[in-house]
Amino acid sequence: LYGCYQGYVGVEVVPSQQDMTLNADMPGRVYSFFDNPNNFAEQLVMLLPLDLALFLNSHWRGKVFSLFSLCAGVAAIGFTYSRSGWIGLALAVVVFLALLDWRFVPLILLVGLAAIPFLPETIYNRILTIGNTRDTSTRYRFEIYQTTKNLMEDYWARGVGLGSDVMKKVFQTYPTIFDGSYPIHTHNNYLQMWGETGILGLLAFLALLLWQLKSGVKAFCAAADVRLRRLLAAAIGGFCGILVIGLAEYTWFYPRNMFTWWFLFGVIAACVKLAHLQKDKRTA
């Protein structure tokens, strides 16, 4: 709600958060209580799919409240102007619908494409900057990736040690990026994990993610309770969304986002446990 309020009254434009040349008419990006619009968007990507499942699982009174919350959340993520957040939420919805009934996927894709001409001009222009190397934030990320490449050449096997503070100190032993500063993290969950823990740590992390997703999908297919299936599909969708965002953002930099990440991981684990219990009862 506070994010929607900020979108209504407007917030100060922060030049470091948006390219003022390519997005000249774009208003300030809302951040709610999270100080950073991308972090706010990450929270919404992880939680909005659960809200959608709550809407489907509730009776009429619960549907009213969850629908209101869902609409407010969708509006708020629009006001963040977070491109990675939009991509993550779109993927989360597609995964959610694909698990429930894959026939929904072509329909939602057609609706999404048909809606593009009706988007506000500022959002449409923001979408067009995705992948544009002239955009300052895109250029900033590629500069960080280049510095990370230099670091990986020295530490790819054993890593530099746990924590973004350690990574920041090691970055300061390499040349600065184009604006004269040093990166504080890699702007990528997987590069960050690799840089901190080495190649074995990265492989273990990827194995954990794949195992959890595989367990979730198997439990979804085995579950008989439609409410559990919806909740599990939502959790898997939100998890896929935040994993994709992790390609462009270090989503664990802020503890609150890391907490929600592991909360979502735990929701999948809890649903898997419930699905197994239900299966055991049916076979007993």
Where do the language-model regions lie?
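Alpha-helical transmembrane segments of multi-pass inner-membrane proteins
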Residues: 1-26, 32-99, 106-114, 118, ...
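A membrane-periplasm/extracellular boundary helix in multi-pass inner-membrane enzymes
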Residues: 5-10, 80, 97-138, 146-154, ...
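Long extracytoplasmic/lumenal interhelical loops at the membrane interface
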Residues: 17, 131-146, 154, 158-197, ...
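Short glycine/proline- and charge-enriched loop/turn segments
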Residues: 21-28, 91, 126-132, 171-178
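Membrane-interface catalytic loops of GT-C/OST-like multi-pass glycosylation enzymes that act
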Residues: 34-37, 81-84, 183-188, 249-260
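A conserved mid-to-late transmembrane alpha helix and its immediate loop/hinge
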Residues: 36, 74, 79, 146-149, ...
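Membrane-interface junctions at the ends of membrane-embedded or membrane-associated helices
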Residues: 55-62, 219-225, 270-284
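Transmembrane alpha-helices of multi-pass inner-membrane enzymes
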Residues: 103, 107-110, 208, 237-284
